[in-house]
């Protein structure tokens, strides 16, 4: 089941499709492997924990509406647009191990769509 993920302002910005992260047009932008998030170029870029995506500094980037993971605060969420058709998934590259994870921090200063698309 696909769901919108919200940024620190409560705006829906990316889509979680159950195994990966997609842009608002339904195109794949990041892999999720266990609790790790990888770019399409197989670089470790963050963590996925209890419905929250954290950046490489372990700062909250986006979250699902039913997330139970650590958030600095839960913003009011705006309405969500309809979900687009989802594109096919290309072959997944070999993914390297993940670095050590720092302690939880605040909200990320990164723009979620830009950060996850790199």
Model-derived regions: residue spans:
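Long terminal segments
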Residues: 1-11, 50-118
């Amino acid at each position: 089941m696909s769901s919108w993920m919200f940024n620190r302002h409560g705006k829906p910005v990316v889509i979680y499709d159950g195994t990966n992260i997609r842009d608002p047009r339904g195109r794949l932008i990041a892999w999720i492997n266990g609790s790790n998030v990888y770019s399409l170029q197989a670089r470790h870029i963050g963590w996925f924990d209890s419905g929250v995506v954290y950046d490489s500094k372990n700062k909250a980037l986006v979250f699902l509406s039913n997330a139970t993971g650590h958030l600095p605060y839960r913003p009011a969420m705006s309405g969500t647009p309809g979900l687009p058709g989802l594109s096919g998934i290309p072959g997944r590259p070999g993914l390297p191990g993940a670095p050590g994870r720092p302690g939880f921090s605040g909200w990320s200063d990164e723009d979620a769509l830009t950060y996850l698309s790199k």
